[in-house]
Structure formats: C-alpha cells, structure tokens
A protein has these predicted regions:
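Positively charged n-region of N-terminal signal peptides that target proteins for export
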Residues: 1-4
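Sec/Tat signal peptide C-region and signal peptidase I cleavage site
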Residues: 17-23
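Short N-terminal segments immediately surrounding and downstream of signal-peptide cleavage
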Residues: 23-42, 183
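Solvent-exposed coil/turn segments that connect beta secondary-structure elements
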Residues: 33, 68, 77-79, 124-126, ...
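Surface-exposed amphipathic alpha-helical segments
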Residues: 35, 43, 88-101, 140-186
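Signature of long, low-cysteine stretches enriched in small and polar/charged residues
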Residues: 38-62, 91-137
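A short acidic-to-branched-hydrophobic micro-motif
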Residues: 60-87, 142-146
Length: 186
C-alpha cells in the first residue's frame, strides 16, 4: 500500500516538473466598452488603425497578451459614425481576417444576445493558426483573436478556443477579481 502511494506521489511530482511554465489566466473587464474576457500573460495596450474599403479608416484599441508562443488580442474598432452599416462592416472585418488564408472554420455565433462570427484560419507560409470571434456592439467591432505561432506548433491547442470563447457582454459575468482594462495611450 505504501509503495503504491509513493509511486503515485512520485509520478505526480514528475508530471508537475515536466509541464511547461504557463502564465495564470486572469479576468479582464472594460466597463466603458461593455465586455469582459480572460487571458494569460502580461497585458500590453496599443493604439492602431483599421482600414477597410467600406469602413474607411478608424482608430483601434488593442489589448495584447503573449504566452507560450500564442498571441492573444482583444481588438476594439470604433465605428460609431457608421453604426447603421453594422452588418456590412462586420462582414468586411471577417473577410479581411480570412482573406488570403486557408479558412478552416467559419460559423455564426451568439454571446449574451450579441450575434457574431467565429473563424479559424491557417496563416500563409506556415505562419501558424489563428482563431477569432467578431461582434458589433454599441457602434464598435469587438474581436478576440488568438494566434498559435510556429514556435509553439500545437495548432490544435484548446487555449485558442478558451480565449475566444471567454468573452461576455454582460459584465456582471466577469470574475469578481477581474482587472479593469486601462484606457488607451494618448
């Protein structure tokens, strides 16, 4: 009996030591933007520009995380000046995400009364695999995107889906210890 317990304990210790170091997942929330999600790694906030043939040029806010050679991004594109064209703008963003890539999955999705689309694509030149969800909420395109880089190589990792599916638009569903997302840099 003692030998079995000792063997089990030894195997558990060995399994713990061989597991890759991964950052803990934390909840993040933006009350002004009205959404929450979970992500691992250190948060970096960036401003950018989105350009589309229909949408034109718009400011973006990107919350970026990298862990274990997987890049996680929450992208917010301010489209309040064209909110009446929501379906067209959302379709254009999805098209641009999948354009020139091998589309593996393209499906409709719904989260908390918000309809959207989910896509998974293989990046060109063996550049990795990316999965994303797009929603049009309150005049903004909100997209969660996870990209497994070639250095990771596990293109079927559940971490992409865990990130993309963690979004909620009912901020009350965010964890109590969720970190408030900072305002964009000026």
């Amino acid at each position: 009996m003692r030998l079995a317990a000792l063997a089990t304990l030894g195997c558990a210790a060995l399994a713990t030591m061989t597991a890759p170091a991964m950052a803990a997942w934390r909840g993040y929330i933006s009350h002004p933007l009205g959404f929450a999600f979970a992500a691992p790694g250190e948060l970096k906030v960036e401003k950018g520009t989105y350009r589309g043939d229909v949408a034109g040029q718009h400011d973006t806010l990107v919350y970026r995380f990298v862990d274990d050679n997987i890049e996680y991004k929450a992208v917010v594109i301010d489209m309040r000046d064209k909110a009446n064209d929501a379906a067209t703008l959302l379709g254009e963003a999805e098209y641009m995400f999948g354009n020139g890539k091998k589309v593996l999955m393209d499906t409709f999705g719904r989260v908390d009364r918000q309809y959207g689309r989910k896509l998974t694509v293989d990046l060109p030149n063996n550049g990795g695999r990316s999965s994303a969800a797009f929603y049009f909420v309150d005049g903004r395109i909100v997209s969660l995107q996870a990209t497994v880089l070639p250095a990771n190589g596990d293109y079927d990792t559940p971490e992409m889906g865990r990130f993309v599916d963690s979004i909620t638009f009912f901020t009350i569903r965010a964890p109590d210890d969720a970190i408030e997302l900072p305002a964009p840099p000026k």
